[in-house]
């Protein structure tokens, strides 16, 4: 999707649709009275007749019948003026994009971003809402009508004084990040018979070639040479070979710090021998959403040319039952040398991650962040509205919380007390791979922290935020691409 800025009077601007933000509390907002007058009191009449109230995310499409150069106005509810923030504005823009899809509008103009005098922050939220709210995935539908998704949005500025910051830079950077989110959504949306580990590796090579990253893919033999036995154990039940994808971006100096991102890449999770219930298993194609987030983040970091050194590690495998599958009761020696008793083959993501986290130590990272659809328990604890956060470094977790608030991809920190380690104790190995239902999200995080040494580390559990069952304004039903905006915001905040 493309974005442009234009200094023009909204009352004189020629366009198919002009998006206008409206409130519920009597606060008219900028340009409301002028537009109302041009329409002969039409906007006031709509409010009086309760056809539209300004309620958050509610929309009303009006034909101007030639009274304005804009053919139609799309009124978008912003709720109460005093409660308007960036995420509400992001939602409103997403609601506008969603409402225009069935109408077949490919281009719009907007003064929605002028509803709140916050400069770049407001513009960013508006652009994100339009770009992410207009997303759809219909690659496999046959006999479909041509797509009518939004392709272009013009952000109007009534006067040069509104341009007290580099608008074009904000538009370009925000569009770049949203492209990366859409890329991640596309990956997660692919069916499991298409997106296998080798497909994910090929996508890594493609973005590396396009954006100037280096890409290395370790095959099964090289993983064995590196003693990645936990990862390889998970892959044993599938005919699809596992892949270990390494993406490197060197935007900083040779001696500058390195941030390593690790994304869980279970391209389909049946649970293995500890088979999942039939109901909902088709959604287990999204168990590589962490890998998609890391790949999308690496794409955005390179496109933005950040002055950082960033490495993305993606352990990719399928978890299936089969004649060679790993079994409950097996003991696996991880790359770190620590032994793991397998009590549940459906607790497989942490086995991929533990070898990847240990491998990451080779880069001597200043910060190590893993992101994974790790536990159903996190969905129970936080629902679909926040990503679970754990870590061993207060500065790192604080930075991720800040990035979550700015990006709208909020996180909530859970404790990582030693007592949770008692749940993972094994009689015959160094630890078990699962500790039962009590505190399951935290015990999973505790398991991971055993493989990071003294490195500053954080774990993001996106099991609840990677997929939308019903859809929300800028997060349509399906894959959300969560993690990309959060991680990019974190990386942009590094000194």
Swiss-Prot record:
Its main location: cytoplasm. Its cofactor is Mn(2+). GO terms for cellular component: cytoplasm. It is an enzyme of class 3 (hydrolase). Keywords: Aminopeptidase, Cytoplasm, Hydrolase, Manganese, Metal-binding, Protease. InterPro entries: Leucine_aapep/pepB, Macro_dom-like, Peptidase_M17_C, Peptidase_M17_leu_NH2_pept, Peptidase_M17_N. It catalyses: Release of an N-terminal amino acid, Xaa-|-Yaa-, in which Xaa is preferably Leu, but may be other amino acids including Pro although not Arg or Lys, and Yaa may be Pro. Amino acid amides and methyl esters are also readily hydrolyzed, but rates on arylamides are exceedingly low; Release of an N-terminal amino acid, preferentially leucine, but not glutamic or aspartic acids. GO terms for molecular function: manganese ion binding; metalloaminopeptidase activity. It is found in: Cytoplasm. Presumably involved in the processing and regular turnover of intracellular proteins. Catalyzes the removal of unsubstituted N-terminal amino acids from various peptides. This is Probable cytosol aminopeptidase. The gene is pepA.
């Amino acid at each position: 999707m493309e974005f442009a800025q234009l200094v023009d009077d909204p009352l004189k601007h020629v366009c198919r649709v002009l998006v206008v933000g409206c409130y519920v509390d009597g606060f008219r907002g900028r340009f409301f009275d002028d537009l109302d007058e041009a329409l002969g009191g039409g906007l006031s009449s709509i409010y009086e007749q309760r056809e539209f109230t300004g309620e958050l995310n509610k929309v009303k499409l009006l034909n101007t019948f030639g009274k304005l150069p804009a053919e139609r106005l799309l009124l978008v509810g912003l709720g109460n003026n005093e409660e308007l923030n960036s995420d509400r504005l992001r939602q409103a823009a997403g609601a506008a994009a969603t409402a225009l899809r069935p109408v077949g509008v490919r281009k719009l103009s907007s003064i929605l971003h002028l509803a709140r005098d916050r400069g770049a922050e407001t513009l960013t939220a508006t652009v994100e809402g339009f770009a992410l709210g207009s997303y759809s995935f219909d690659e496999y539908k046959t006999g479909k009508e041509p797509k009518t998704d939004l392709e272009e949005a013009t952000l109007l500025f009534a006067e040069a004084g509104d341009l007290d910051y580099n608008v074009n830079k904000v538009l370009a950077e925000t569009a770049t990040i949203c492209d990366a989110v859409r890329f991640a959504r596309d990956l997660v949306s692919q069916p499991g018979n298409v997106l296998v580990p080798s497909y994910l590796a090929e996508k890594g090579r493609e973005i590396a070639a396009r954006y100037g990253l280096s890409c290395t893919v370790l095959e099964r033999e090289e993983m064995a040479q590196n003693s990645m036995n936990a990862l390889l154990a998970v892959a044993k039940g599938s005919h699809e070979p596992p892949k270990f994808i390494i993406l490197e971006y060197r935007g900083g100096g040779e001696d500058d710090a390195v941030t390593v991102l690790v994304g869980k890449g279970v391209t389909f999770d049946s649970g293995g021998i500890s088979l999942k219930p039939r109901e909902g298993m088709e959604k287990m194609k999204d168990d590589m959403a962490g890998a998609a987030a890391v790949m999308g983040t690496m794409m955005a970091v390179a496109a933005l040319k950040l002055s950082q050194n960033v490495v993305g590690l993606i352990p990719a495998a399928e978890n299936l039952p089969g004649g060679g599958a790993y079994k409950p009761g097996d003991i696996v020696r991880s790359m770190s040398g620590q032994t793991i008793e397998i009590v549940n083959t459906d607790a497989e993501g942490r086995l991929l991650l533990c070898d990847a986290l240990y491998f990451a130590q080779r880069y001597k990272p200043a910060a190590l962040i893993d992101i994974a659809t790790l536990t159903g328990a996190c969905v129970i604890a936080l629902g679909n509205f926040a990503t679970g956060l754990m870590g061993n470094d207060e500065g790192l977790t604080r930075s991720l919380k800040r990035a979550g608030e700015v990006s709208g991809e909020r996180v909530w920190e859970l404790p990582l007390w030693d007592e949770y380690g008692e749940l993972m104790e094994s009689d015959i190995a160094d630890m078990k791979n699962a500790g039962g239902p009590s505190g399951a999200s935290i015990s999973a995080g505790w398991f991971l922290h055993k493989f990071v040494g003294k490195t500053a580390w954080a774990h993001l559990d996106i099991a609840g935020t990677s997929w939308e069952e019903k859809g929300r304004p800028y997060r349509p039903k399906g894959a959300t691409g969560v993690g990309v905006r959060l991680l990019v915001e974190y990386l942009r905040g590094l000194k």
